[in-house]
């Protein structure tokens, strides 16, 4: 399954473009722009599994740095600062990674 099976390619392109500048990433606005906020909980979990590149059941800090590439292969990497900010927002239990429930909460709070 690919991201465009779940989200509009046009919405993804617009959202990636909106955060093309370094240190401009805002996960709340991004999740809204790609249409993730409007998706069912099941679809949000499918997106999580696409972003969980190593299939560990978690999105670790190194995977978070490449989160935009999970939506579009030509997107930029997040900066270290953006990655830490995203991790802090999503890692509710403080284990240094984001699980599927934490990701679902992160999306629903956006």
UniProtKB/Swiss-Prot annotation:
Binding site for Ca(2+) 2: 91, 93, 95, 97, 102
Annotated Pfam families: EF-hand_7
Cysteine disulfide links: none
List of residues binding Ca(2+) 1: 52, 54, 56, 58, 60, 63
SMART domains linked: EFh
Residue numbers of Phosphoserine PTMs: 2, 8, 24
Molecular functions per Gene Ontology: calcium ion binding
Keyword Calcium: yes
N-acetylserine carried by residues: 2
UniProt entry keywords in alphabetical sequence: Acetylation, Calcium, Metal-binding, Muscle protein, Phosphoprotein, Repeat
Residue ranges of domain EF-hand in the record: 39-74, 78-110
CDD domains in alphabetical order: EFh_parvalbumin_alpha
Homology family: Belongs to the parvalbumin family.
Protein role: In muscle, parvalbumin is thought to be involved in relaxation after contraction. It binds two calcium ions.
Free-text domain note: AB domain, comprising of helices A and B, is involved in structural stabilization, protecting the hydrophobic core of the protein. It is required for high-affinity binding of Ca(2+) and for Mg(2+)-binding.
Protein name per UniProt: Parvalbumin alpha
Organism: Gerbillus sp. (Gerbil)
């Amino acid at each position: 399954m690919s991201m465009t099976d779940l989200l509009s390619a046009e919405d993804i392109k617009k959202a990636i473009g909106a955060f093309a500048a370094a240190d401009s990433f805002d996960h709340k606005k991004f999740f809204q722009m790609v249409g993730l906020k409007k998706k069912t909980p099941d679809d949000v979990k499918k997106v999580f599994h696409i972003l969980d590149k190593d299939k560990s059941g978690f999105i670790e800090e190194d995977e978070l740095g490449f989160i935009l590439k999970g939506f579009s292969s030509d997107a930029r990497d997040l900066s270290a600062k953006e990655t830490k900010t995203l991790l802090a927002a999503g890692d509710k239990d403080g284990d240094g990674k984001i699980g599927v429930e934490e990701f679902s909460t992160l999306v629903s709070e956006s």
